[in-house]
């Protein structure tokens, strides 16, 4: 009888926990994000560029004549803004000039074309007699002559030539195609790739010599931050080691670890390789996270693990100095286990999930107006299956079992405000087809969200996050001061949480180390998911790391 009563009470307590546990985040859900994401952007990026060694026109004839009209003869393949070209020509029409002045006009038109997608274009004066003041100016786009390789790196010639195979002799030299090839070489090899243009053997052609010089064969980073959750350890310490161009064909290996000051451990390894010659990559990764809950809930004996196997890849559509677009895709398998020892095997939650995802990512830069736009869009379809009795009870109560779809979007815009300031606007959001398992939810509180609230606060199936941040670049190189406003809104079923806050930050970036500190205060109080929120109006965040 006593044993029966014990099981009855235990079952009642567990059922009482269902409502709160199904709606609340898993204790370590905020640590299930992409490993190493807090240090993204701190490692060196691709290095590529185009140099033009073709000579400018020169003339010493100072005989003046009146220019009444300029006829621009452009090959059909060249596309540019007619209004901008017209403004350049109108500055010369109706005025006296010399042959040197016309050569200067040629250089202006040439520079315009080269900065607008045709790096080998050239304007020139064909043989003509201009007795009536009418001048004919021709523009040729520049076509590939010989494409040569000067490889002084560990990246194998065969791999490099594969990227250059699309630069065919006789075709128009376009910035987008040439820089995409150069940046893709740099992305995979870790080397610096520069294309040098020189005069070709025949009129209207340019030879291209691609120089590849070795970069760092590997990089390492160690860092410390306090971006963790309260129950599993706010202070965390991480390390990551990346090896580039492992086999001379562009493959890459990343190994990393993250541990907290309490009882969270996260380890990951991935391998990425080049597939074909178009820059398509395919990788495989494995990560394992384990945790134990501390604090007021420690008496429950809550602990768990998450094992994730990922297959992922990308395909560049184009990549230049000022714009990039790439397709991304992947598959994830997760096995999740969450136990509460205080209730025995009845509180063991075991589940697994599969998902496939595809999206686009890239950036666009408007140098003239000082604007930079980064974007990332992902669509995910998956299935979550409960593997234990307690997990099935949770899934039934919350409606999280079975198939789901979700869409995620992130957009960041940076507008320059003179030489020492800019304003950054960040927007992100998630939409879902149903109530999601906690491993698939978003959260709106934390170091990379509304910074006035703890990590993982405001979890939801769908929601939006926004930040407006003013940044001032001080006279100390690399030191940036900022002030910002964060806001987020998330919802689960009919329950909605809104969080707002403001703060100040100080960041320092050098070639081999980085640091950032933030102090944020909440505005009002969102639906209190944690008692500590109502007690603490301000929060302090830091991140610091060293790169080798």
PLM region spans:
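Transmembrane beta-strand segments of outer-membrane beta-barrel domains in Gram-negative
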Residues: 274, 281-424, 428-430
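Repeated loop/turn-to-beta-strand initiation elements of outer-membrane beta-barrel proteins
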Residues: 193, 218-220, 247-253, 277-283, ...
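Outer-membrane beta-barrel translocator domains and adjoining extracellular loop/strand segments
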Residues: 266-270, 293-300, 337-346, 385-394, ...
